[in-house]
Amino acid sequence: LPSGMTSVSLWLFFLGLLHMNLYFRLFWLLFWRTRHCRKIDFLGTSRITYRALPSDCDINFHLTNSRYPAFMDLARTYMLAEMGLLKRFLKLKWMPIVNAAEFTYIRDIKPLKKFEIETKVVGWDEKYFYIEQRFISERGLHCIVHVRGVFVCKGKQVPLEVLVKEAGYTDPAPELPPEVVKWKAFLQLKKERNL
């Protein structure tokens, strides 16, 4: 062992490196993967594959719940790259902010197993955009998530009509899926009861 380093501190050092894997994934995504991605339209489905590393898993030997949002952040970033919007939005200093998310876990993802995340914009209203994300493997659907968010610039929300226009989308807004409509109503009820 290096001078002054005990076996415990060495173990903690390696644990720290393992937890850096999200940063490594982000750097790989930004500096390599986005340069070699396919192109999709604004309402297209983006797909990216990952593997559940041991550092992504918990004592139940499956992908820990706290990792799902981290993978989702990466997948949404990749979706913007596939749409051809990532560089443009960064140049405009438009930053995405999640307002709400709802998760339905169906089956677990075991250590070292590959899984794919499907990400797509399912619609928007006068204030928010809505995204659906699915975790899928050869075993089937593992988790489905709905995300509601906005883009902000200098502390102010980017109007949805400006965002959609910048994305080059000119068709009418798609109708929100029924489950998203009910979720939206539920969020409104929570807001009314708690503010």
How would you name each of these model-derived features?
Residues 2, 6, 12-36, 109-116, ...:
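HotDog/MaoC-like acyl-thioester-processing domains
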